[in-house]
Amino acid sequence: MPYPVGQTTGLVGLAVCNTPHERLRILYTKILDVLEEIPKNAAYRKYTEQITNEKLAMVKAEPDVKKLEDQLQGGQLEEVILQAEHELNLARKMKEWKLWEPLVEEPPADQWKWPI
């Protein structure tokens, strides 16, 4: 359900999205596509995939903008879209960084000891 023309989010620098459901479906699908390239046993994939699938199901099930905002609990849908864009960028970086692989070298023995 598109917002009425001329309505504002009330947040500086955050424009109204006229098709928030479509935009969120696209973003969540892209996130899931990137996650499929990460090993299934990686913690990041496991938990991000679960959360993203839950959010995608909410977007598909709830056509009302206000009700969806309440269900997602992330503010206005434009804010949720921004969060999803950030998550997509992070997923791509996690894939690039390959954090699931073992360390190249062992960390120093007292690396986390404080005070030194």
Swiss-Prot record:
- GO CC terms, sorted: mitochondrial inner membrane; respiratory chain complex I
Q: State the compartments where it is located.
A: Mitochondrion inner membrane
**Residues recorded as bearing N6-succinyllysine in the entry:** 98
At which residues is N6-acetyllysine found? 30, 46, 60, 98
Which GO BP terms apply?
A: respiratory electron transport chain
UniProt cross-references to Pfam families, sorted A to Z: ETC_C1_NDUFA5
Q: Answer whether the UniProt record assigns the keyword Lipid metabolism to this protein.
A: no
The membrane topology term of the UniProt record is:
Peripheral membrane protein
Q: Which UniProt keywords apply?
A: Acetylation, Electron transport, Membrane, Mitochondrion, Mitochondrion inner membrane, Respiratory chain, Transport
Give a yes or no for keyword Transport in this entry.
yes
Q: Which InterPro entries match?
A: NDUFA5 (IPR006806)
Coiled-coil residues are none
**Record function comment:** Accessory subunit of the mitochondrial membrane respiratory chain NADH dehydrogenase (Complex I), that is believed not to be involved in catalysis. Complex I functions in the transfer of electrons from NADH to the respiratory chain. The immediate electron acceptor for the enzyme is believed to be ubiquinone.
Assembly description? Complex I is composed of 45 different subunits.
Q: Identify its protein family.
A: Belongs to the complex I NDUFA5 subunit family.
Q: What is this protein called?
A: NADH dehydrogenase [ubiquinone] 1 alpha subcomplex subunit 5
Q: Which organism is it from?
A: Pongo abelii (Sumatran orangutan)
